[in-house]
Swiss-Prot record:
InterPro entries: Elp3/MiaA/NifB-like_rSAM, Methylthiotransferase, Methylthiotransferase_CS, Methylthiotransferase_N, Methylthiotransferase_N_sf, NA-bd_OB-fold, Ribosomal_uS12_MeSTrfase_RimO, rSAM. [4Fe-4S] cluster 1 binds at C13, C48, C81. Residues 374-440 form the TRAM domain. This is Ribosomal protein uS12 methylthiotransferase RimO. It catalyses: L-aspartate(89)-[ribosomal protein uS12]-hydrogen + (sulfur carrier)-SH + AH2 + 2 S-adenosyl-L-methionine = 3-methylsulfanyl-L-aspartate(89)-[ribosomal protein uS12]-hydrogen + (sulfur carrier)-H + 5'-deoxyadenosine + L-methionine + A + S-adenosyl-L-homocysteine + 2 H(+). The gene is rimO. Pfam families: Radical_SAM, TRAM_2, UPF0004. Gene3D superfamilies: Methylthiotransferase, N-terminal domain, Nucleic acid-binding proteins, tm_1862 like domain. GO terms for molecular function: 4 iron, 4 sulfur cluster binding; aspartic acid methylthiotransferase activity; metal ion binding; protein methylthiotransferase activity. [4Fe-4S] cluster 2 binds at C155, C159, C162. Residues 141-373 form the Radical SAM core domain. Transmembrane segments: none annotated. One of its GO terms (biological process) is tRNA modification. Its EC number is 2.8.4.4.
Length: 444
């Protein structure tokens, strides 16, 4: 019997990527994975439905993949946040889709595909769940030397602009022993860098242990053989404790890199956003981090054009960015998401004002990064090799998240392996990237 060929298109965030990797692990037991949609008997589109742009990208991708039903494709499957949020509506709007699964129903994937192939049945499963997740096996879609490691699912923060709690459910931590087991599995399969993710990593453990236990988890991850770098994302400022900051200073495997989603700094805007912190708390946390760990690279994300954001609020945000000079910064225009409290707030900001404010902040950030990178010339960093483009090796130091932040380009006389770590001396700077050379000097 000819094996079914599956094609998978994964959109959206790193949590979605993990979902795709779990699905691929399941379907490869029954068939073959192909990267060419023209060859696929079954195409799965794992969607993002977080903001308007991501919804549009998801719909466009579904329609693009539906064209292959004129050729070899027999079943088109849509999974992920968009189907969880709009399942029934999408099923009516997109008759080309055979199977629609939400984020809690991936265990029904194989049966739904089988019913579609054998009986022509359409399936819709978009159930809401607060069960604790267990990743099981995964097929990595990243380079083999790094992987994302999810420690919790869902969110209890209920920011007024965000639909994630409605899509992903309440916050559910995984047991420490399950996380450590997965980290060991990843290490045994060649992973050297694990990137810790959740909607909010700093809340980890509160729901199952009665206290926030992220520092304890990081200590245990440090003991996993083969893991050289641990990178931590999505740390909410109000939950960054002295204990966590101390762990950054102590833990030799924990990269001096942290992602802290701040979103804004004006107290009036933060209050309307439903954020738990305020300007005083945020600035104190950032200063405490830099005081205890001076080499810490802090990434953050900001939202401009939130309802009621006045010019003085935006000026306060610009002053904040100028003062703290983040190594990595993402700036997003507020997206009016239906079903969220912010969508019906008064004083919605015009789209052109949002765009102007975003461009202004990004111009500031380009100048800031230019200055930061200039100070790196002649310094030596440990760099992991991510790729080779035929002329240069492409790598990252501890300050760089793969595929998101900048990169370091360098040449080497000998052949290097992907995932190998080398010492690189920085020679030149580009806008966000660096150019260097392999050197014999020590690095860490």
């Amino acid at each position: 019997m000819t094996k079914i060929k599956y094609g998978v298109v994964s959109l959206g965030c790193d949590k979605n990527r993990i979902d795709s990797e779990v699905m691929i692990n399941e379907i490869k037991k029954e068939g073959i994975i192909t990267n060419d949609p023209k060859e696929a008997d079954v195409i799965i589109v794992n969607t993002c439905g977080f903001i308007e742009d991501s919804k549009k990208e998801s719909i466009d991708t579904i329609l693009e993949m539906s064209n292959y039903k004129n050729n070899n494709c027999k079943v088109l499957v849509v999974t992920g946040c968009l189907s969880q949020r709009y399942g029934e509506e999408l099923q009516e709007l997109l008759p080309e889709v055979d199977v629609m699964l939400g984020v809690n129903d991936y265990d029904k994937l194989s049966d739904a595909i089988k019913k579609s192939i054998e009986k022509g049945e359409k399936s819709l499963y978009c159930n809401y769940s607060n069960t604790v997740i267990n990743e099981g096996g995964r097929v990595l879609t990243t380079q083999k030397h790094y992987a994302y490691l999810r420690i919790a699912e869902g969110c209890d923060n209920f920011c007024t602009y965000c639909a994630i709690p409605k899509i992903r459910g309440k916050y559910r931590s995984r047991k420490i022993e399950d996380i450590i087991e997965e980290a060991k599995f990843l290490s045994q399969n060649g992973v050297k860098e694990i990137i810790i993710v959740a909607q909010d990593t700093t809340r980890y453990g509160l729901d199952i242990y009665g206290e926030k236990t992220l520092p304890s988890l990081l200590k245990q991850l440090e003991e996993v053989d083969g893991i050289e770098w641990i990178r931590l994302l999505y740390c909410y400022p109000e939950d960054i404790t002295e204990e966590l900051i101390e762990e950054f200073a102590r833990n030799k495997k924990l990269c001096k890199y942290v992602d802290v989603p701040i979103q804004h700094i004006s107290d009036s805007v933060l209050k309307r956003m439903g954020r738990k912190g305020n300007k005083q708390l945020v600035t104190k946390v950032l200063r405490d981090i830099k005081k205890r760990v001076p080499e810490m690279s802090i990434r953050t994300s900001l939202i401009v054009g939130f309802p009621g954001e006045m010019e003085e609020d935006f000026k306060e945000l610009k002053d904040f960015v100028e003062e703290f000079k983040f190594q990595n910064l993402g700036v997003f225009k507020y997206s009016q998401e239906e079903g969220t409290p912010a969508a019906t707030m008064e004083d919605q900001v015009l789209e052109e004002i949002k765009e102007t404010r975003r461009e202004e902040l990004m111009k500031m950030q380009r100048d800031i990064v230019k200055s930061i990178n200039a100070d790196k010339v002649n310094k030596v960093y440990k760099v992991v090799v991510d790729n080779f483009n035929g002329e240069h090796y492409i790598g990252r130091n501890y300050e760089m998240l793969p595929e998101i932040d900048g990169a370091i380009y360098f040449k080497c006389d000998k052949i290097l392996n992907i995932g190998e770590m080398v010492c690189i001396k920085i020679l030149e700077t580009l806008e966000y990237d660096l150019i260097g050379v392999v050197c014999d000097e020590s690095c860490k």
